[in-house]
Amino acid sequence: MEFPIVNIGREHVDRFVNEIAPLVCNEYIKRMTHGEHVIYPSTCIAQAALESGWNVNAKTLFGIKGDGFVSDTTEYIDGTYINIQDSFKCYPNVATAIQGFYDLMQNERYRAATKAVDWVEECKEMYNCGYATDPNYSDKIINITETNNLTVFNDYCLAILRGEVSAEETDNSGRVEELADKLENGDYGNGRDTRAERAAQDGYTLEEYEAAQLIVNERS
């Protein structure tokens, strides 16, 4: 059973999902194995897409409030959408942003969401728990999930946890970091096409190459 690849036909969507999905699934499986409170991968990915505008390079992938940087945002207050400035946490890379999201889910505030019976109820509870003020928030992340077939990642992770497929097939974070180091060191040259081709010759997938290139960009 191969790791799912989303191919919706919209380049920015496909790239976003396929770059962060392996990292989200790794974190989900790890947290489930340790008995922690979790949110389905599909919901995590959908929230990241909505909060960042499908921008994997966004300073705040999940729109988590906290010390970091100040940015314009829209909040729904007293029945009205209001543009304000607020402070958001900033993470050094996608992997740590995902870890930060799942760390946040350990808060008792989100217990109704992490105990939801399915991903649809989970999306509804994310709004009820106060993750966002937009009354349409749940509908938006449900729509993103359904439109882009994100539940395939839930199925894959649950298959691993049931022992139906080896976790080694999705635990590629070490390979991605290794490839990022090689790219940064110039082991595969400077041309993008050349680097991708040489990485493929060494057995790396295109998804691993794209994820590694993202890490390199974040380091610079």
Residue positions per predicted region:
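Catalytic cores of secreted/periplasmic lytic hydrolases that degrade extracellular macromolecules
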Residues: 1-170
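Acidic, Ser/Thr/Pro/Gly-enriched interdomain connector segments
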Residues: 7, 167-174, 178-179, 185
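A general structural motif at alpha-helix termini
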Residues: 48, 130, 145, 199-202, ...
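Surface-exposed aromatic
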Residues: 120-127, 181, 191, 197
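Extracellular glycan-binding segments that recognize GlcNAc-based cell-wall polysaccharides
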Residues: 126, 174-178, 214-220
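Repeat-associated, polar segments at repeat-unit boundaries in modular proteins
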Residues: 152-155, 200-220
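Extracytoplasmic Gram-positive cell-surface binding/anchoring modules and repeats
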Residues: 173-175, 184-196, 204-206
